[in-house]
């Protein structure tokens, strides 16, 4: 592969912060990309963390309007809820994030996109399939599926490499928030 540049869906959490360093060690030039879907996170701090960890660039994009108009409202109108109670909040955001990543990858001349999904859930499928449909020329790299680390291993890796993350062995998981989680 001649172009080793990729765009990483960056949340600022443990998986994707460790992924920046891991991908760099594998020879990738990492561009961190965060999409604001209405979460109550300090996006400037997330962008700064990506750069501190080693991303060559870090972008934050506002995806709130397309998320609401193209994903949330149509799904609510269709009654798309899980167990008759929960909107498919996280699931709805993944295709939009992937589509926006494809745009950034093309603009930046990247040959791949990457995400921090594990091999256990459906999020990986949403990223992988959306990318394959919109940009079959782009490789999809999934470090968490490849590296064989569990959460404690990731925390140890982060500590060893001086990566500051909002996770500890006592509280290793983060949660996902976006506009579809608000009460309407």
Predicted segments, located by residue:
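ATP-dependent adenylation/nucleotidyltransferase module used to activate substrates
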Residues: 1-166
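Short linear loop/turn motifs
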Residues: 167-180
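Conserved small/polar residues in nucleotide/adenosyl-binding loops
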Residues: 182-184
